[in-house]
Amino acid sequence: MFDFASYHRAATLADAINLLADNPQAKLLAGGTDVLIQLHHHNDRYRHIVDIHNLAELRGITLAEDGSLRIGSATTFTQLIEDPITQRLLPALCAAASSIAGPQIRNVATYGGNICNGATSADSATPTLIYDAKLEIHSPRSVRFVPINGFHTGPGKVSLEHDEILVAFHFPPQPKEHVGSAHFKYAMRDAMDISTIGCAAHCRLEERQFQRITPGIWCCRANADSLPTCRTDCTKCAIKPANAGSYQRICPARCRPAFFMAGQ
């Protein structure tokens, strides 16, 4: 049995925000894949729960007429993987989502929970970074939009106040031609393991040069990082085999790995 001190199921987003504001000790429950573990271990910091699982405001994948994309924070990883819009526009995010745990977890774990948990092994962080996403965050005071770059402030730490809720991810219109993106995950085991290293990259080509390249790396760093100096160094570089060694050296030189490994 879970030892709840209080449990509230929010009916609306406004209701959830008010419940958080009224109870400084409350924790949000969406997919629950991390929260339920804490409850199972009788973590005293998780005795007051606000359930936001069924809030319509946190659901849906919507493509606007201008090409911008909104993904609700309670979207599950299975929904991300299977949606034709994300498959077409955000392939690196779909690849990262596919690498997370097993099907049972992906069916319930949410995109927003993976980002807000602040774990250094969060597989969705680097693809969110390379696509220049902004986070829509609601509180009793305001609605703010913040870039994903800088949202993570340290292991298990994010720039989110107690009474704030991540409602959605907003992606700018993605170029339709001469672009590519990819995600890579290294784990100690292939099957359902957390990341030791997670990286992704998004690039746009023009006349056989990198017109724009955005790398992202995490797990071996305390925070998700877009490596801005690496972005500068690689932009305008000619794409040819002779430069491959230079590309391979640039990112590790800028990475400054964290002092720990994820999962240890």
PLM regions and their residue ranges:
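C-terminal structural segment of proteins
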Residues: 1-264
